[in-house]
């Protein structure tokens, strides 16, 4: 079943989106605004495990891709890594939209997420979307130094060639900005 954009926009009229690059301040800003204005906060990253449990490898292959080691994960080409990252986000989006429709039926919701400009325009009016963009020069160290991303940083540091893994992540995150 496919829903037209105008239908999704109507059902998401109580949802405001804060999106953008990693380390751009999305979580900090969305939490502060949700608290200040009494909005329900929906953090897409916090829902990933829940959505993954509901996913099906046939329909959400990127969400269900497993890597045996940091070397396998970070050893992919930048193009492979970027495509996996974008596909992962796209596959989770269906779960996110349904959650947002349910949550926003009778209240305002602020969604901390990863949308492209095209997705944002398809699902919402421009006045309800904020993009926070960070200079991509060294995202991996900033990302890894955050308390909520220590697991990722430890995984990265378990790679055989840590500097190459960091470079792959930085380039991938930079190239994924093009899709924002």
Question: Which sequence ranges carry the predicted segments?
Answer:
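Hydrophobic anchor at the beta1->P-loop junction of P-loop NTPases
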Residues: 18
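P-loop (Walker A) phosphate-binding loop of NTP-binding proteins
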Residues: 21
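ATP-binding Walker
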Residues: 24
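Walker A/P-loop
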Residues: 27
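Short beta-strand-centered segment that lines the nucleotide-binding/catalytic pocket of NTP-utilizing
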Residues: 39-54
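ATP-dependent small-molecule kinase phosphotransfer cores
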Residues: 50-108, 114-115
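ATP-dependent NMP and nucleoside kinases share a basic, alpha-helical "lid"
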Residues: 111-155
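Conserved small/polar residues in nucleotide/adenosyl-binding loops
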Residues: 178-180
């Amino acid at each position: 079943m496919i829903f037209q954009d105008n239908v999704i926009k109507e059902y998401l009229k109580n949802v405001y989106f804060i999106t953008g690059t990693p380390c751009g301040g999305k979580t900090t800003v969305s939490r502060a605004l949700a608290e200040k204005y009494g909005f329900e906060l929906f953090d897409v990253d916090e829902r990933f495990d829940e959505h993954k449990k509901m996913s099906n490898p046939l329909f959400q292959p990127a969400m269900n891709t497993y890597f045996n080691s940091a070397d396998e994960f970070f050893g992919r080409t930048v193009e492979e890594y970027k495509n996996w990252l974008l596909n992962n986000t796209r596959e989770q989006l269906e779960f996110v939209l349904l959650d947002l429709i349910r949550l926003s039926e009778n209240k305002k919701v602020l969604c901390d997420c990863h949308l492209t400009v095209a997705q944002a325009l398809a699902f919402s009016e421009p006045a309800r979307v904020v993009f926070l963009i960070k200079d991509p020069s060294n995202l991996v160290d900033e990302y890894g130094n955050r308390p909520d991303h220590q697991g990722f940083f430890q995984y990265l540091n378990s790679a055989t060639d840590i500097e190459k893994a960091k470079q792959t992540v930085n380039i991938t995150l930079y190239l994924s900005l093009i899709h924002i």
